[in-house]
Amino acid sequence: MRHHNYKAVMKYLPVITGVLLLSGCQAVLLDPKGQIAIEQRALIITAFCLMLVVVIPVILMAVIFSWKYRASNTAAKYTPDWSHSNKVEAVVWTVPVLIILFLAVLTWKSTHALEPSRPLASVVKPVEIEVISLDWKWLFIYPQQGIATVNEIVFPVNTPVNFRITSGSVMNGFFIPALGSQIYAMPGMQTRLHLIAGETGTFDGISSSYSGRGVSGMKFKATA
């Protein structure tokens, strides 16, 4: 009896493990709170749908062909000398080429439109924030207001925020998933990032680049 129960548990263990792991995930990228993140979500969904154009037919054909040409199906058409089909060649080459061309144009336009250093068009004066990554915290300086904070930033909603980012230690990745666009913080260099929050809230910020033992706790809060 115990052995039977053990086998039943082991049978569903992968499913249970998967559910537990996924329960700790958040679909932040699919629930954007800013202009840049909304445009990036559209790009992700478009690329995903184009991928399904290839993936779904392949999966269906694998299932259909396996069933149709199974050993027990004596009624299946048998063509041992088949070697070429112009129709098949046209499909397997044309569809991927069209998808690649579409993605190439989309990527080119999106890369320039979502360039992190490109200022956002707005009638509202942007907020300037200097960002310095340290071990294992974030230092934020407001040069216009003459104040500084650690692991917390606050800015007005619907107002562009111009980040000037560098590192006082090793390289890190500055990322507010709900607002979009990750960019590196590098020692001796300055990178720029322009974001805007479309609604009020407190958003999680992280270091998206592994930089050492304490990187998992290198988080901050961004409040709009």
Segments (PLM) and residue ranges:
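N-terminal secretory/membrane targeting signals
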Residues: 1-27
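Hydrophobic transmembrane signal anchors and adjacent membrane-proximal interface regions, especially
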Residues: 11, 50-53, 126
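Non-transmembrane, membrane-proximal soluble domains of secreted or membrane proteins
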Residues: 26-43, 67-224
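Alpha-helical transmembrane segments of integral membrane proteins
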Residues: 7-15, 46, 88-92
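Alpha-helical transmembrane segments
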Residues: 43-69
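Transmembrane alpha-helix boundary/anchor motif
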Residues: 20, 61-64, 106-109
